[in-house]
């Protein structure tokens, strides 16, 4: 521990470098990092493909796919904010990160993860209007409205996370320079503070409510409204057809909120060892961005049709 704290002095407001524990001292960590890198490649390729398909095909320039485009963008940002730094620590066997780099890492991880939450809520709004008010859908939801809404979400999210990180700079991080996490997580960094800043504590609670509890409640209430509307449809065929339009979104919600909530509940209830907790939490961050493109490609007829056209054109060019 003395070597870890070599750059650390209690006479300054913060250490020059932090030491991120990551998966320290476990023999199978290399296999986990290889697995993580494979997830990263799949997530980046999958989401980049979704971005290109939506950007290049005008038939997908609709309110629903504006949301999907933003989600793919957030997924790429989230994986790039987290995994490359973890791979750097593994490949170069260097778990140190500078103070400014730590703040940047904290901002981008929370920023893009927060965007994933808010975009899922926005997509649930789209589905509620489509199912509950189908005749008014095109009057309420259009490209202009969705572009303005997503622009506001990006700006609001940047303001909240920027404020959270800015307040961290006001803390005197004099207890240690060891961050017991796999990235510069706000909670472990806050635990290093020698001065108890009530504003930081209160903002942490607000952020938890805003980014975890509120989105889950809104999504649940959205589906309550959807299922109530579906119960009024007399034919089973009509119900199934309407429910099918929500299938992709329900799977996205499940793959995002279930791993995140499961990881934190397991950590609270079962007193997981630090390394097991880090593995479960890190997987909850990276699994959804990998699965989201697969969900939309497999469940959305429009995207499958575009891919089919591209493959057909490519095969036609090859045969010529």
Spans of model-derived segments:
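Transmembrane helical core of 7TM receptor-like proteins
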Residues: 1-320
